[in-house]
Amino acid sequence: NRTGVVKSMTDGYGRKIDYMRISLTDNCNLRCSYCMPEGKISDIHYLTAETVLKCVESAVCLGITNFRLTGGEPLIYPDIEKLIAKMRNMSGVNFIGITTNGVFLSEKADVLKTAGTDSINVSLDTIDSDEFRKITGHSCLRNVIDGIDAALDSRIKLKINTVLRSEVDVLKMIEFANDKNIDIRFIELMPVGIGEKNDIIPRKAVIEKLEKKYGKVCGVSKMHDENGP
């Protein structure tokens, strides 16, 4: 916007759009059965830092102030901390989040915090090592848990994203998150594409299990302030 006047966008319900997700790469180091199963080859594609920064600059001119970096797996993006630092120095950028599988988080947490990362969402579907290997195709659960602990030590706001499937022990995931004082969000797998081949657990069954353990589940009056996983 050459005039310096910031425009804004609204959705069909009149709500202001101020949030953008940027997929830095479609490559990932894991092969989750509901996302990129074993045997599917992902070409290594990265958006250049220049492209990302131009995208952010243009988005800010449209009133976008909150950004989340995703993938694939964003922590395999070369020098992601340098990209985040440049984004943080851009006028109009208020929030930078990352969604990651957490495998490389223990070695990146401090530099991500220093660069200006506001929050990290860790995708974690189980804390059982055998189930983790079945879901992801890799035996690196310990790396993810160490990454979560490192992010907590760095005082980065943290949240766990868990995809609901029949294999997922919802109560154990809640206890894990509660023990570490982390928010957890359960994500429903849609029965389309790869999702048709996965054993989906109905939301009603999850609510019944939660109410049996914790009592009546209360609804929410408004959306959470982080705009999605």
Describe each region flagged by the PLM.
Residues 40-43, 128-135, 192-197:
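A short acidic, helix-capping loop that chelates divalent metal ions and anchors anionic groups
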Residues 41, 74, 102-103, 164-167, ...:
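Short histidine/acidic/glycine/proline-rich micro-motifs that form metal-
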Residues 171, 176-179, 183-229:
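A C-terminal junction/extension of Radical SAM enzymes
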Residues 26-28, 124-126, 188:
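Short, small-residue-rich loop/turn micro-motifs
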Residues 1-2:
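Eukaryotic N-terminal low-complexity, Ser/Thr- and Lys/Arg-rich leader segments
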Residues 5-95:
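Conserved alpha-helical substructure of the radical SAM core
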Residues 49-68, 77-183:
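Radical SAM/AdoMet-radical enzyme domain recognition
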